[in-house]
Amino acid sequence: MARNAISDDEEDHELEDDDGEPVHGDPAEHDENDDEEDDDDVGNEYENDGFIVNDEDEEEEEEEDEERKDSDEERQKKKKKRKKKDEGLDEDDYLLLQDNNVKFKKRQYKRLKKAQREQGNGQGESSDDEFDSRGGTRRSAEDKIKDRLFDDVDVDDPPDDVGDEEDLVVEEDVVGSEDEMADFIVDEDDEHGPPKRGNSKKKKYRQGSDITAMRDANEIFGDVDELLTIRKKGLASNQRMERRLEDEFEPTVLSEKYMTGNDDEIRQLDIPERMQISEESTGSPPVDEISIEEESNWIYAQLASQLRESDGTFDGRGFSVNKDDIAKFLELHHVQKLEIPFIAMYRKEQCRSLLDTGDFDGANQGKKPETKWHKVFWMIHDLDKKWLLLRKRKMALHGYYTKRYEEESRRVYDETRLNLNQYLFESVIKSLKVAETEREVDDVDSKFNLHFPPGEIGVDEGQYKRPKRKSQYSICSKAGLWEVANKFGYSAEQLGLALSLEKLVDELEDAKETPEEMAKNFVCAMFENSLAVLKGARHMAAVEISCEPSVKKYVRGIYMENAVVSTSPTADGNTVIDSFHQFSGIKWLREKPLSKFEGAQWLLIQKGEEEKLLQVTFKLPENYMNRLISDCNEHYLSVGVSKYAQLWNEQRKLILEDALHAFLLPSMEKEARSLLTSRAKSRLLSEYGQALWNKVSAGPYQKKEMDINLDEEAAPRVMACCWGPGKPPNTFVMLDSSGEVLDVLYAGSLTSRSQNVNDQQRKKSDQDRVLKFMMDHQPHVVALGAVNLSCTRLKDDIYEVIFQMVEEKPRDVGHGMDDLSIVYVDESLPRLYENSRISGEQLPQQSGNVRRAVALGRYLQNPLAMVATLCGPGREILSWKLHPLENFLQLDEKYGMVEQVMVDITNQVGIDINLAASHDWFFSPLQFISGLGPRKAASLQRSLVRAGSIFVRKDLIMHGLGKKVFVNAAGFLRIRRSGLAASSSQFIDLLDDTRIHPESYSLAQELAKDIYDEDVRGDSNDDEDAIEMAIEHVRDRPASLRKVVLDEYLASKKRENKKETYSNIIRELSCGFQDWRIPFKEPSPDEEFYMISGETEDTIAEGRIVQASVRRLQNGRAICVLDSGLTGMLMKEDFSDDGRDIVDLADQLKEGDILTCKIKSIQKQRYQVFLICKESEMRNNRHQHNQNVDAYYHEDRNSLQLVKEKARKEKELVRKHFKSRMIVHPRFQNITADQATEYLSDKDFGESIVRPSSRGLNFLTLTLKIYDGVYAHKEIAEGGKENKDITSLQCIGKTLTIGEDTFEDLDEVMDRYVDPLVSHLKTMLNYRKFRKGTKSEVDDLLRIEKGENPSRIVYCFGISHEHPGTFILSYIRSTNPHHEYIGLYPKGFKFRKRMFEDIDRLVAYFQRHIDDPLQESAPSIRSIAAKVPMRSPADHGSSGGSGWGSSQSEGGWKGNSDRSGSGRGGEYRNGGGRDGHPSGAPRPYGGRGRGRGRGRRDDMNSDRQDGNGDWGNNDTGTADGGWGNSGGGGWGSESAGKKTGGGSTGGWGSESGGNKSDGAGSWGSGSGGGGSGGWGNDSGGKKSSEDGGFGSGSGGGGSDWGNESGGKKSSADGGWGSESGGKKSDGEGGWGNEPSSRKSDGGGGGW
């Protein structure tokens, strides 16, 4: 069967284990599998262009070329991959062994083994036997069983089941001497070392067992042969089963079903599952008293800080936390392995301050408890995890620092430097030990890496290395300037100690020479004079200060406490953000302190900044800035007054200024942003959790008193109803009290309003059927899904049926049917269930509407279980919209909070085990029970379902629960007569139906007996019957429990410290497992309105602008419909300002008109809004400040005017430099670029115009309309001009050149260049695989197509909005979209450096060569840099010479797009983007789908490009190459495989180092080595340093991609995702997943 092409990474994973060694050992097996795949792939054809490419086929087609091109290094790598195949012997080797009388095991094909095993013949059975570890020959299972039966085993012999490590095992008697076989037996693990001898220890072959012992065994056990046969079958079956699981299921499937080996270990280990999962990342926690005390101190400080941020309270409760309680919690958690729910329920006495214990005093004994979210416990739990990870990191860094220091010490011979290094190392280790936060550890790490930069440690020979980029600090240090830096005075560490007042430093001694005189001694080739030496030394000192942990801690303290943030709108933002916009409340913030940010406000600011709608500035107020500078000067400058002291102080001031402004303050701003993001996410996560808590802590629907039968706790019978538009129809589902489906009814005509006779008859029939349906099943409540306004009519129709039933058949109606409630239920969760995998497993035969209705009814019966149902492996619960800003949270963050909430609430509610054993949907919360998890819960569930029911709690141990897990879980698992146990007469302990833990049963029994003795005035026996009688007595008479004075009773028993435990016992004896959840409440009118309309308080409010469609006109008013289906009423007087003069609205409007109105008022009960269209009202912003306004909100009109004035001046400047031309041609006009795009805006695709160029009088520009909003500009160079005067220059040249083509006049340009180009453009636009839309929109279409055809490689073409004039070929092979660029030329389409006259040929080539690496020669670094765009088209500017400009060698398109700027204005307004109901249901009247989205600035992941030049956005150009010109380079061009500038340089999507790169390859390793300039050299007109790096050195620091022309200062390290010293950032590497030769297929790295 055909399969999708897989990446090289996937192949490596399949062939190699962690050590790089192949996993599958049988070479024949690999060869056979390859043959099978080749045979299968012969018949593959492309079907509907969903093609499948096989890597092996492609490799065979170009095998000869590959062999010629493979370097020695690549061949060595391939040889390593095939290593396992070579370990088998050839037939000649086997013959040679036979000739030498050597016994051996000849490998068989895997398929032959399997066939022999299935046939059961002797040969097949023996193939699975093991070798005898003593004799060297095969040992049968029979021998092994005999050993076990008769104890005939040598004590010194190893176990028989130890696997052999070698393929050849030689018998001593046959082989002879050891030396004879030395050449045959080689240890396969020591590939490069000397051969090892085969059997270093010779053993004799077992001769057999004693006959007498065999006879005795036969008499005892029967025929041993029979036993052997059974065992052989069992072994074969087990082996086949293991193979079946691993071979027939994908690893993801096994992982999802918790069937991996690791899952099995978790199930078996007697430690709570969630603890095991946590410890996989944190490691085992320390359990000694010192460690627990140290951690509790740290957690106490962190917790106090968090509570202080919340104004000193938590949830409005002003309680204090006891540090000893934290230590006790850690002991219970880590030492005794108890989870939070258990501690909160059964260990209250040991950590009282962590709980709100107000409900547990004697005065509140009779009060019903409420469910509580134990937030403090969970905060401590999270801090505990942070502490363990911090401790783990510190230990790892300590080991690394020690190793690195020792290696550095061996390389340095200068005694002074050795002493300095030792001092620095000891200082770093000391700082590391006292570091208390991740940020402080980062500071220590920064200091260590500054003084001990990472070298090539741990890099194996021959391994690819990232080109190292030397920092200015390292250059200065190697030049010996560290000695000069040490002469400035105090060291960075001394300054830090002085600032933090930890240590008083000695007074500074002034030098006896000037700084310049001292610097002369260090002049060298790199630093040619004393000024250069001082500048370098000052840089070193400033960097050291900025990396000193104590200095950073001091500056951080001031900055984080006092820094302020201001926001203002950009020009686009001012247009887009109106009074109802998401960013309206943060549009103008003035100097808001960091500590005043609440909730998720900062996340909105961050989003606004990313979308270029807001400008954000951080600032340290002037008084605090002056204080900071003053403190630094005070402790760093000399107090001397001599000339020398003053000169040295001038140098020190420069150092401090550089340290603060160039390093520390930018670093602090970055930290402040990170801190605000972390805080905002934490608070948003808490709000998200609170929203979920409110849902799951709500109790089920309660039956009315008259409906209560013998089982008071039985859930109500529910008739669930889902509205349907006709296909599917209205659906009614009847659920019994266990949530199982009893009956289903479809009634499509029930809500019909037609007066047609036939329709009326169908409606009457449906009413009768619904009536009979309800009469037959007697529901307690009707659950109606609230999805749109039609549901209100459906509710009325159901009530009509109920009234008819009560009137016509009162005797047949059950109690309460005349008062039957119809309850609206939100359909958002049921819709998730309808489309989930679990619904397909639970209700496989039912339709989607039925599944949704089942979820509606079950949600009324048991909200907790219904929510937990969607918390399975699919995690559908994460799609439940609970918070308007939840999209800012990662899925893992959300699920962590979901798990926390579900664990807390589930254990307070408990689970009825016997009921769940009969109805598996009740088992869904089981994974959240204390001690369990998805793996242990699934195992327990299977065991309980097999048993059917359970009668004693302690029997849970027999169902796979270990002792520790049982202790955690037992109190929350309820054992009662339900499910199958309801019909059993077996005894059930009443205490098992309470929350009383088994460890407290004796206390409960003693209390019950004491009360019983008191009531009956006698002393009963202590036998079980008497105790049971006492428990029944107190349970039947709760009043007797309330008489107990708890304090006196505890004093009499001397158990004063058990008050909370006894309170729990009394409560549970009164009413076991009482439901503590909030009682069910029907939705309020407001809630019903928002559910049915699909609106929220934010999307519909008075003053909001909406669009309405006129449906009907009446005298004096127009009846309209909003997008949500709400009815809008527009009165005549509200239509316009002169409305009183309008006689009839019909004269002004007609049906179908779309109006833009403002909401005047809302009538929620009638689902109506009143609208107003008056122009004066539309301009009025009186509703703008109705919402809560931030205290720091101050609108700055002056700033706005400056923005507008700047934009106006830029336009004037363009017009000022515009020079008209004296050219007469129908296709030429004297207009600017903006005017040209405006002129072409309403023209057809392919229309063009020639205009003057902004480059001067020797150029023209051809502007071509590619698509709506996409225009390309092609430069035309004029030649043969006479430069006599301005008039001759304004005339057209004698020759016109575009790229390498020359034309005589504009007519020839049109005929030979433009017309063919337009023809090819229209061919592409009309091609069957062309898709309109942006890159992301096309990707979404592809994902949908991929979902429908998962086995195909789907692809399509689209317009490149980022690079006008090119097309994008997008395709998906597995999951992620990949992109390649196609150039548009008059000769055709250029793809991967090949020209194609028509698209079909291009497609055929692409399908055959989808995985081909780009093998052509690579251009120089400088030629590539000339083609790399330094600004996006939306920025309307070139990048200082190259960028988007055109080319003289081939010519370059330049492009701009309408998709930026004010063209986006207003897209956020009026509820844009609401194209449907939040629950996912369709709108009854349709709706609009307005919205806006924005991709990342450099959304070029996995992209290749072959353009035809430089598709830019400005009129400026450069002297060299365009995209993919003759000079090479470009995206996906010949930038691979060759060495450039001393290193092997890869291109974008090229082959970097020799293997394929699927559009995400690295930029090559070694690029720019040997001083060959970096990417972005000369960018922005400034020369970059010779150290490489993308735009490195421009403007004093390396520039990141997307920075302004490389000329502005960026981080000192630069590079895309790169850090100082070439380290990986974000844990995954830089450009294209490290500069190794593996293919990066969206698997981690990339841009």
Curated annotation (Swiss-Prot):
Biased composition (Basic and acidic residues): 21-30, 132-151, 1496-1507
Domain of life: Eukaryota
GO CC annotations, alphabetized: nucleus; plasmodesma
Assigned keywords, A-Z: Elongation factor, Nucleus, Protein biosynthesis, Repeat, Transcription, Transcription regulation
Acidic residues bias: start-end ranges: 7-20, 31-67, 152-191
Mapped Sequence repeat ranges: 1443-1444, 1452-1453, 1511-1512, 1522-1523, 1530-1531, 1547-1548, 1563-1564, 1574-1575, 1601-1602, 1615-1616, 1630-1631, 1646-1647
InterPro entries recorded: HHH_9, NA-bd_OB-fold, RNaseH-like_sf, RuvA_2-like, S1_domain, SH2_dom_sf, Spt6-like_S1, Spt6_acidic_N_dom
GO annotation terms (biological process): embryo development ending in seed dormancy; transcription elongation-coupled chromatin remodeling
A GO molecular-function descriptor: nucleic acid binding
KW Iron-sulfur (keyword) present: no
Compositional bias segments (type: Basic residues): 103-114
Ranges annotated as biased composition (Gly residues): 1462-1471, 1519-1532, 1539-1552, 1561-1579, 1588-1600
Disruption phenotype: Embryonic lethality leading to aborted seed development.
Positions of the UniProt region annotated as 12 X 2 AA repeats of [WG]-[GW] repeats: 1443-1647
Subcellular location: Nucleus
Chain intervals for the UniProt region annotation (Disordered): 1-209, 1429-1647
Pfam family, one: SPT6_acidic
Domain S1 motif per the UniProt entry, residue ranges: 1103-1174
Tissue specificity annotation: Expressed in shoot apical meristem, leaf primordia, vasculature of young leaves, inflorescence meristem, floral meristem, young floral organs, developing ovules and anthers.
PANTHER family for this protein: TRANSCRIPTION ELONGATION FACTOR SPT6 (PTHR10145:SF6)
Purpose: Transcription elongation factor that enhances the transcription elongation by RNA polymerase II (RNAPII). Plays an important role in regulating embryo apical and basal patterning during early embryogenesis, partly through negative regulation of the transcription factors PHABULOSA and PHAVOLUTA.
Family: Belongs to the SPT6 family.
Quaternary structure note: Interacts (via N-terminus) with IWS1.
Protein name: Transcription elongation factor SPT6 homolog
Source organism per UniProt: Arabidopsis thaliana
Gene: SPT6
